[in-house]
């Protein structure tokens, strides 16, 4: 139901909206494959956000810097984005990924939830994402679009 409401917003796009909805669903209806695709996209979203953060750091702190948006030459009044701090942060990130890799590759179920092994049911909203009663009018409005 939630996948239907969210993706039906795409159907408001003229001419190609319905095609986009069917592409996202993987067919003409929401079924187990669609829900598994949504779960996979929700897994990938943090990595996409991390990539955007890295792109921001590269774009804003490379040559011009966020303290000099006009690109005016005058490095004497601009603080550098200290390489020491970048290196320190990279060491921290690498240590985090090493620890995370140990869990992922050697103990995959240590931090898991037994709910992860339950097959998705397209006819039942999972209890963790059941909408609150005060949001139901807004969901009704979205469904009517």
UniProtKB/Swiss-Prot annotation:
Functional note: Component of the ubiquinol-cytochrome c reductase complex (complex III or cytochrome b-c1 complex) that is part of the mitochondrial respiratory chain. The b-c1 complex mediates electron transfer from ubiquinol to cytochrome c. Contributes to the generation of a proton gradient across the mitochondrial membrane that is then used for ATP synthesis.
One of the protein's GO biological processes: mitochondrial electron transport, ubiquinol to cytochrome c
Note in the entry: Heme 1 (or BL or b562) is low-potential and absorbs at about 562 nm, and heme 2 (or BH or b566) is high-potential and absorbs at about 566 nm.
Keywords: Electron transport, Heme, Iron, Membrane, Metal-binding, Mitochondrion, Mitochondrion inner membrane, Respiratory chain, Transmembrane, Transmembrane helix, Transport, Ubiquinone
Membrane-traversing stretches: 38-58, 85-105
Family classification: Belongs to the cytochrome b family.
UniProt xrefs under Pfam families: Cytochrom_B_C (PF00032), Cytochrome_B (PF00033)
SUPFAM superfamilies in the cross-refs: a domain/subunit of cytochrome bc1 complex (Ubiquinol-cytochrome c reductase), Transmembrane di-heme cytochromes
Subunit structure: Fungal cytochrome b-c1 complex contains 10 subunits; 3 respiratory subunits, 2 core proteins and 5 low-molecular weight proteins. Cytochrome b-c1 complex is a homodimer.
UniProt name for this protein: Cytochrome b
Annotated source species: Aspergillus fumigatus
């Amino acid at each position: 139901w939630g996948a239907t409401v969210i993706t039906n917003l795409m159907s408001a796009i003229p001419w190609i909206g319905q095609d986009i909805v069917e592409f996202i669903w993987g067919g003409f209806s929401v079924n187990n494959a669609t829900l598994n695709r949504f779960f996979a996209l929700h897994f990938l979203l943090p990595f996409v956000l991390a990539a955007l953060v890295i792109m921001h750091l590269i774009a804003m702190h490379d040559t011009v810097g966020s303290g000099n948006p006009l690109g005016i030459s005058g490095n004497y009044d601009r603080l550098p984005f200290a390489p020491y701090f970048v290196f320190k942060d990279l060491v921290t990130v690498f240590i985090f990924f090493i620890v995370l890799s140990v869990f992922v590759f050697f103990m995959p179920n240590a931090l898991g939830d037994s709910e992860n092994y339950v097959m998705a049911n397209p006819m039942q909203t999972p209890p963790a994402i059941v909408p609150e009663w005060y949001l139901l009018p807004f969901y009704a409005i979205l469904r009517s679009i």
